[in-house]
Amino acid sequence: MSVIEIHGLKPLLGQVSIQGSKNAVLPMMAASLLHKGITVLSNVPLIQDVSCMRDILTCLGCRCVCQGNCLVIDARQVSETRIPEAYVTAMRSSIIVLGALLGRLGEGESCYPGGCLIGARPIDLHLMALRELGAVIREEDGILYARAGKDGLTGARIYLPYPSVGATEQAILASVLAKGVTVIRGAAMEPEIRQLCHFLNNMGAVICGMGTSQLMIQGVDVLHDSSFQVEGDRIVAGTYGAAVAAAGGNVILKGADPGSLRVPLGLLEQAGAQIIRDEEKKEIQI
């Protein structure tokens, strides 16, 4: 077992740059499949899940180039419709690629995330949303085969009985290029969903209601090349903030959005921490 040994009784001092949000960048990478062109993402965290999603995109026909924390995705040659099983079982969030493939190519194939073949499946809401949009989905030997109709996916009213982040992302990705209007009620309201919607709108999508439990998506025919900076990871920033509050000291968290950390920052202040927020610079001083 690995051991982390901490020698405490010392205050934490200085500044730290908060890496880009993992939970925001992964659906953005999946969304790049919707555009027959080039997408540039900056402030991309150099972590295993990002490498896994990059490998998935490469297997589907994308050309991905990393330049430091910048990721360039060229999706012009996407033609493969099956998400490699090894990656789906390694990273459960990879299932959202299915919605992007349906939107772009009209079909997609995937095993169940984590290799789950029996019992209650956590992607039931994903499949329900795709079916509401007109996808025909069947299972054979543990593989999901999803197909859109001959005219593609069609906008629909989707109600999520639980505000699942993954199912919300799945429905958004499948709806962007669908014909007509899609309304998602009971949508997740996490900051990462808001980021995904802003990212897609930056590519030419038409999404309204960001930050609320009801999203409205007007389908478009095509998207365009775009560049987007991923916001700092609120979980990482909150962890650093808690460490400073516990150990004492003075630290500036650069690239941390105070608006996404209202609750944890409020709790730290209740515990006695002094916090300065800079919404414009995206900085927090504790």
Where are these regions (language model features)?
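Structural preference for solvent-exposed beta-strand-turn elements
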Residues: 1-286
